[in-house]
Amino acid sequence: MERFKKASSIIETLKQQGHEAYFVGGSVRDLIIDRPIGDIDIATSALPEEVMAIFPRHVPVGLEHGTVIVVENGEPYEVTTFRTESEYEDFRRPSSVQFVRSLEEDLKRRDFTMNAIAMTEEGERIDLFAGQEAIQKREIVTVGTAADRFQEDALRMMRGIRFVSTLGFSLETKTKQAIETYGHLLEHIAIERITVEFEKLLTGTYCVKGLKELVETKLFSHLPYLQMSEERLLKATQYNWDSFETDIEAWAFFLYCIGEEHPSVFLRQWKFSNKKIKDIVAVLLTIRKRKEKDWDTVLLYKTGIHIAEMAERVYEAMIESYDHTSVERVQTLFQALPIKSRQEMDVTGNDLLNWASKKPGPWVAEMIQKIEEAIVQGNVVNEKECIREWLQECNLL
C-alpha cells in the first residue's frame, strides 16, 4: 500500500473540494493479486478543468478523454474524470465521450471485471461487478455481455489473451466463446495497437498458456502473416520461454517457432521500428551461424556482446538446453578479446598511408580489416609497431 499512500493526498484534496475520487484499474487489481504495482490511476467526479484548477502542477495530456496528469510528491499520476462512452466507431473507438458524476457508470464501461474495481484512500474496495471473485477464481470475465464489450472495442479480445499470458488466468467460458465468435473484428484494429498487446503476450510469465488460448480461440487467424500458422504456433507452446530477458529475444524465438522465412517483411508488416527490426534479424542471423559452430573470437567480435547474449539465450531455448552458464561463457569470452571494437585498434588508415607510401584507395579498408581480424585472433599484438612489423613479415606493406 506504500505507493498508494504517496498518491492518497490527491484523493484527499479532491474530496476536500467536494468531489469523489478513487484508485482504479490495473493497480488495484495487482494489489489484490499481490503483483508489482505499475502506474497508479485515479478516477474522479471532478471535471478536467476542475482538476487543473485544484492542482497547479499538472499536464493536460488527454483532455478530450478527461485525463490530466497531476504531479504529486515528484510522481506523475493520471487523474481521469468519470466518463461513459457512446456508440463505438469501427469497433475500436467511441464516437464521443460524456463526463459523468457516477462511479458506477465509469466502471461499467471497462473491459474486464478484474479491472473494474475501485478503492478508497483507506483501502476499502468498491467492487460492483464481482471482480474480486473473478480474481479469486483466476478468471478473465468481461464487464457485462462479452459480445457487447468486444464489438465496442475489438482490441479487448487481444488484451484478454495478453492477460492470460501476464497473469496466468483463464478465459471465462462465455468470454472465450465471444472471442471465437467476434475474432474477425480484430481486423479493424490498427496493427500498432495489436503489436503492443502481442509483445506483452510474448514476454508474459505464462506465455505458453497465452499462445494456446490464441490458437484455441482462433484469434491468430486474424493477425498479419499468422493466418496459416496453427501448427507452428502449437509448436511454440512446446518450448520453455522463461529464459528470455528482452522483447527482442521473445520476437526472435517466436519467428523461429513459426518458421518465418522473411522476418524483416513480417516485422515491417507489424510496424516495428527499423532499429528493432535490425536487432531481431541480427539475433536470428547469429543463431544461424551459432547452429553451425560454437562461438569463436571472430564470430563473437563481429556480433558484439549485446546481440551475442540475446542470440545465446534464444539458441539455448531452441535446443532445449537451458544451461544458464552458456551466456556467462559468452561474456567471459568477450571480455577476453584483445579489442572490443575497431575504435580500439592502435592503427588508423593514415598510419597505413604513411607506411606504404601509396595513394588512398579500397586497399586501406581491406588492410584495416585484415589487421582487425589478426588482432582478434591473437596473431598480432594491438600495438602500432607490432602491427607494422607483422605487416612487413606478411609482405602486406
From Swiss-Prot:
Transmembrane segments: none annotated. Keywords: ATP-binding, Magnesium, Metal-binding, Nucleotide-binding, Nucleotidyltransferase, RNA repair, RNA-binding, Transferase, tRNA processing. ATP binds at G26, R29, R110, D153, R156, R159, R162. InterPro entries: Bact_CCA-adding_enz_type3_sf, CCA-adding_enz_C, CCA-adding_enz_firmicutes, NT_sf, PolA_pol_head_dom, PolyA_RNA-bd. It catalyses: a tRNA precursor + 2 CTP + ATP = a tRNA with a 3' CCA end + 3 diphosphate; a tRNA with a 3' CCA end + 2 CTP + ATP = a tRNA with a 3' CCACCA end + 3 diphosphate. GO terms for biological process: RNA repair; tRNA 3'-terminal CCA addition. Homodimer. This is CCA-adding enzyme. It comes from Bacillus cereus (strain ZK / E33L). The gene is cca.
